A protein has these predicted regions:
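Class I S-adenosyl-L-methionine
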Residues: 1-201
Length: 201
């Protein structure tokens, strides 16, 4: 499949400025868990960055909604594979989250077909991860289950996690000292690192 056709099918990829590679994003309003947490003071989703700034532009919202609708297209796996192939690093959902178990299974298939790419996916959707054996996840994908509240410890049901610290907390992500970029850090993609702690955005 040509990349032009793949972009038309999927709505294309995003290019987050801090990341070492492209990403796939969905509207934050469609988050199953995040849409509830955004109303909870002290939660990581309160004041969600994906509901502010450039994400509010009409053209950006239109692109996000196109990507959401594209998840139902039977050609989605093939098209996403065509777009990602050849990339060293990929991030799932710099905005948005897993929509269903079928969506997650389709992501697994894309990862299997792009075995030379390292994939990272943060999520708050415990309901779907609890239906998955971590041992069955493609080895080039790391899914980090994110804790819901600021300064909350990591969850204990999943081997890879992420947490968010208040400004005085024990943040491990170096991006704030690196012009808000990953730089040479690849901790989020590294299965040998059980938890990554971010500062509150």
């Amino acid at each position: 499949m040509l990349k032009k056709e793949a972009r038309e099918i999927t709505g294309g990829l995003s290019k987050p400025s801090k990341m070492p590679g492209p990403a796939h994003n969905l509207p934050a309003q469609a988050c199953k868990t995040g849409a509830k947490l955004v109303k909870v003071p002290g939660s990581v989703c309160a004041g969600c960055y994906a509901l502010k700034g450039r994400y509010r532009f009409n053209n950006v919202q239109a692109a996000l909604n196109r990507r959401l609708q594209a998840l139902e297209d039977p050609r989605w796996v093939e098209a996403m594979t065509a777009l990602i192939k050849g990339e060293k690093f990929f991030r799932w959902h710099d905005s948005g989250d897993i929509q269903s178990l079928k969506h997650l299974e389709n992501i697994f298939e894309v990862c299997k077909r792009t075995s030379s790419t390292q994939h990272w996916m943060p999520t708050r959707e415990a309901q779907f991860l609890k239906q998955v054996d971590p041992a069955t996840i493609p080895p080039n994908l790391i899914i980090r289950m994110s804790s819901h509240m600021i300064d909350q410890g990591p969850v204990n049901f999943w081997p890879w996690t992420s947490t968010v610290a208040s400004p005085a907390g024990n943040r491990t992500c170096p991006a704030p000292e690196q012009n808000n970029e990953c730089g040479s850090c690849r901790a989020c993609w590294d299965r040998s690192i059980p938890n990554v702690c971010y500062g509150k955005h």
